[in-house]
Amino acid sequence: MVAHAGSVAVRLLADRSGLTKELGKATARRLFVPVHDRGQVLVDVAVMLADGGEAIGGINVLRHQGQVLGPVASAPTVWRALDELTPAALKRIEVARARVRRHVWAQLPKLPASQVADTDLGGVVVLDVDARLVTAHSEKGQAAPTFKGGFGYHPLAV
């Protein structure tokens, strides 16, 4: 089992949609090859925020998932990557995001229609998400139990 499994889906979405690569190109600098691609660092920050992180130090949660996510930059590397963002780089990031968004939207007509009981649902997209909670075996600070009295979290909602 993988804790915070939903964060893997966010990272895969960024990678497979081309966002990570486009951000890497938008933040690339001449004659400088960083250990961690700056596009990947920005995606990791977004994944960390989607995973519930509230500070740059929250990136360490992703670093503990290295077997699933691969190498994740340290907090100081994230700070350096953010410090490197100039107004021109932010504009290139904006253009890169728009390019990827257009690409993703262009792929939607290629999706097969959803069907239920051999009935075509047309443009409706069906998401079948498992609602089970992952049990946490200890009460966390100021946590309220679920309606069943246990403690846990939904891996796609954290």
Language model regions located:
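Dynamic "connector" segments at or just before major functional cores
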Residues: 1-158
